[in-house]
Structures are given as structure tokens and as C-alpha cells.
Amino acid sequence: MKFTKMHGLGNDYIYVDAISQKIENPNEISKFVSDRHFGIGSDGLVLILPSDVADFKMRMFNSDGSEAEMCGNAIRCVGKFVYDKKMTDKSTISIETLAGIKVLEMTVENGKVVLVKVDMGEPILKAETIPVLSEKHPVIDEEITAKDYCYNFTCVSMGNPHAITYIENVEEFPLEKIGPLFEVHEKFPKKTNVEFVELIDDSTVKMRVWERGAGETLACGTGACAVLTASVLKGYVGRKATVKLLGGDLIIEWNEKDNHIYMTGPATTVFEGEIDI
């Protein structure tokens, strides 16, 4: 299997052209290649496939083998993958995902993609669609308790569920202890990604994320979009803000005209190779 390892702000996946090669049992392959000791090492596997409704189709799998709807960092890399490999000559393309069709605008320098702006679509605020068990609409400051920990969560879906809460010091927060408790909380029928956010100023927030099925990662694009949405809903920031993640910064904008969230950030190729599976 030929592959390319890429990352968006350190959120790394193994990318495979599944148009020119047949990939069977991607769930197991993802578990294998993701292993940082016995595999290649990544947060998961991304397949680029043909699409009947868009330029390309993306399927992505977490390091535990589960399939995910969408990943903002991964989709930026998909744009770079197909452009840099001359699978397309368009700098604006559409990608089919389980969370719908996403449109990417790519900034190209010297024939290579350096930045990708993604139309992430409208944030979903309806409790049953997120899904979260709540009577509120939108779900702002829903008090949720797990063991001895209690937080007020604002819940948003960007095609995948996110629960966002605000804390004083995100760097020193014991995420690996508390994140998993809320990821699998009964309030979230499909589990959830959990974001802990520190407010820096009215145009900057800093976050750490516990990703559903992957644990803490250096960055989560849909998480950054959900955090911006929650922060606007709570009146903390304006409609355009810098979201600081462990792996770097994303610029997120909630456009008032079309109600869509736009995410701009880098995409980086690490190396290419071939592996027996």
C-alpha cells in the first residue's frame, strides 16, 4: 500500500489514494498504521476515493479503527494531497464526507498547496441532531457531572459532536484524566469530542481537545470551529477569531451572511512510503 503521511497542525494521518489502489478492511488497516511503535504512527487513516457528487470523497478512520464523519485538519491535507499529486488542477474543489460536501479554497505557492480555507458548513445547534440529551436550544451551559467533576458545557455539531467548556488555565488542566469521563458520558448517545477552552481576549481563544476515539491530539479542526461557535454564542468573541491549539493556530470565521463556518490553516506533507498490509 502506497501512502503519504501528512499533518495539519500536528494532527497526523496516513493518506492513501484509494482511486488507484484497492483498500480492503480500512478499520483494521487504520489500527495497524496508526500504531506509533509497530506501525507508521498517526492519529488515523484517510482514504481518497472517487465521488458521484463532488470532486473527491474522503473516508477517515480513527486510531482505534472507528470511522469518523469529518476532520477539519484531515480535509485540508486531502486538498493538498490531490493538488500536489496533480489529481486535480483546480485550486477550489469539493470533497464528499460523511458530514456532507465541503468546499476547499487552496493557496498555492510554487506549485504546492500551503494554506487551505475550508467551508465547514453551518454549525448544528439542535440537541437531538448533535446529539446530546438536553431540553435546551441551543445547548448553552448544560451542567454535566462525571464522577466528582462538574462543568457547564455548550454543545455544537460540525458534522460530529462537540462539548465545550471554559476553564482558567488550559495548559495545566488534567485533560487525560477528565476528558475520557465526558467523552463516554450517557448524555452523549454517540459519545463526544470534548474541548476545554481558555479565553485570551475577544479575538483569541486557546483550547485543548479530547477527541472521540483518539484521545488528546495536537489539533482538531472541527473542534476549533465548534469552539468559535460556542464562544460567539456565549458572547466571548467576535465572529472571527484565532483559535490556538497545541499544534498551532487556526483562523475561524462564522459568516453572518451564509451562517457557514470557515476554517483557514496549513497542511503539511511529512513523507511518502510503501507498506505491506
UniProtKB/Swiss-Prot annotation:
Gene3D superfamilies: Diaminopimelate Epimerase, Chain A, domain 1
Active site: C71, C220
GO cellular component, as recorded: cytosol
InterPro entries the record matches: DAP_epimerase_AS, DAP_epimerase_DapF
Pathway recorded for this protein: Amino-acid biosynthesis; L-lysine biosynthesis via DAP pathway; DL-2,6-diaminopimelate from LL-2,6-diaminopimelate: step 1/1
Subcellular location: Cytoplasm
Molecular function GO terms recorded: diaminopimelate epimerase activity
PANTHER family with a match to the protein in the record: DIAMINOPIMELATE EPIMERASE, DIAMINOPIMELATE EPIMERASE, CHLOROPLASTIC
Protein's name in the database: Diaminopimelate epimerase
Gene coding for it: dapF
